[in-house]
UniProtKB/Swiss-Prot annotation:
Encoding gene per record: trmD
Stretches of the chain forming a coiled coil according to its record: none
Single GO biological process annotation from the record: tRNA N1-guanine methylation
Gene3D superfamilies listed in its UniProt record: 3.40.1280.10, tRNA(m1g37)methyltransferase, domain 2
UniProt GO MF annotations: tRNA (guanine(37)-N1)-methyltransferase activity
Entry protein name: tRNA (guanine-N(1)-)-methyltransferase
Keywords assigned: Cytoplasm, Methyltransferase, S-adenosyl-L-methionine, Transferase, tRNA processing
Record-level GO cellular component terms: cytosol
NCBIfam families in the record: PRK00026.1, trmD
Annotated Pfam families: tRNA_m1G_MT
Enzyme Commission no: 2.1.1.228
Entry annotated with the keyword Coiled coil: no
Family to which this protein belongs: Belongs to the RNA methyltransferase TrmD family.
Substrates-to-products reaction catalysed: guanosine(37) in tRNA + S-adenosyl-L-methionine = N(1)-methylguanosine(37) in tRNA + S-adenosyl-L-homocysteine + H(+)
Amino acid sequence: MRIDVLTLFPEMFSIFNHSIIGRAIEKEILKINTVNIRDYTIDKHKKVDDYPYGGGAGMVMSVQPIVDSIKAVKKENKGKVIFLGPKGKTFNQNLAKELAKEEELIFLCGHYEGIDERAYEYIDMEISLGDFVLTGGEMACIPIVDSICRLVDGVLGSSESYEDESFYNGLLEYPQYTRPAIYEGKSVPEVLLSGHHENIKKWRKAKSLIITDKVRPDLFKKYKLTEEDKKILKDFNKKL
């Protein structure tokens, strides 16, 4: 997958040179480029923003450098142009799965009080991270790109690495434990030490269902319980 990020602060994306995403870039599974929007302004002072027509607080990103940077990137990247903004669809795991199927994507990070409305003609999709205010689009772009990239084939060791994670199947993840088996009198659940893979699988599914119901009832309501799920919960509750 190729991703180009249009931003005023390209240095913020150096985080992708590390850990799982960094290794995927080294293996050429991913290619993440940053493009400085400021490089495309025709203003002699390198300005990329101006006062809003009609008055108001703050500054607005100018249409010219935004559009010219999009056009330049589009010569090599034919993917959707995604703007990180408050009017967009709220990002979630399902949207991450859909975007992970794309071969190319372009992200546009806004700043200041927003972008000139005329730039929207060059934008295919707007995504919001949530109902809260951030300093700039970069803050939203980083977790969104990370979430998408980890679902690209080959980025993680195996599909099991992300299929068991919270949200992937509509549920929160089960509890995790590592050594020591006993710490300050608190023991790891016996089933996890048993080596019985089927029982471990059922325990994890039961805990995942119970935790989701308790912590995120909104997610649990959307989840469709199978007959196997119901049996796992029934058997789990009998052992309590």
